[in-house]
Amino acid sequence: MKPSSKIMLRVALVLGMIVLGVLLLRAPVVPDQVQILDQLEAARAAGEAHNVNGILRIVSDKYHDAYFSSPVQLRLLLNKVQENGSVRITQSIPVVTVKGDTATSTSHLHITGAEDRVVYDHDVTMQWVREDGARLGVIPTKVWRVVSADYGNLLGY
């Protein structure tokens, strides 16, 4: 390859990176409530698809609640629910309240299993925090994750 071709290739790569950077920086800012609603919908869809990892994507490593002291224990429960076959998950439109780097979402969750057996039917309140994350896997950004939840009585299920 000629030296002039190498220079042109490098210039083209640099210009391409600049254009990509400008496009990423100019991406519209999504409101906090919409980010949380999108994550809740993605988790609901993941639940119906038996994708425990997809559900746990919204959960912080610092997660704990009245029943579980870590996301690992939560994963065990979700795996057990998923083993019982297909589930149908309906969720009321969540009410999201954001205060700085914390937020609360409240909605009603109804889960049915085989033969329309009710697996879960309660209101769920989730506590969210804004944590460090990455967009496109490399660009540092803040993401909303669940750190705690109140979801009624699990002992009946």
Where are these regions (language model features)?
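Short, low-complexity N-terminal intrinsically disordered segments enriched in polar/charged residues
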Residues: 2-57
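Short beta-strand segments enriched in hydrophobic/aromatic residues
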Residues: 47, 59, 109-111
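Short beta-strand edge/turn micro-motifs at domain boundaries
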Residues: 2-8, 118-157
